[in-house]
Amino acid sequence: MLAVHELEETVIGDLTMFQIDKKTKAEMGHKAVKEILSGLASGESIEQLIFEFDERKTPEAQFAYYCDKLECDIQCKAYDEEGCVDLQHQEKNNTAKNAEVKQLLASGKTWSEMWMTFGQQRYNYDPNFEEVSNFAMQNPITEKGKNK
């Protein structure tokens, strides 16, 4: 499920909630998945895994969903520690224009602290995943971060 859940992004791109509404993204994504997988021997079973992930009703789908969100948190933290985020030049970034995001950044949070805090509030993390996210937020995770 984790290996294939972003297959749609090969067609529609990695669209965020700041770029497109959830319903439209789901419709575009499902159409893209059907097109990509049509005619493949395992196409239907892969399609069902993707749709199961999107619905997040099974324990496996919920686990995969939280893993996906946590991976984004950890990657954001690594980017921050490696100096890949410049908060002074975000004019074209729709995320940085969001009122909640602006408020979190104005409070002095780094980009990754903002992203993780926003994600925890928005995605209603399972307590175990929230604990891992908090650990990543409060501790360096890259060599560069450890040496600061």
Regions found by a protein language model. Give the residues of each.
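Alpha-helical, largely C-terminal catalytic domains
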Residues: 1-148
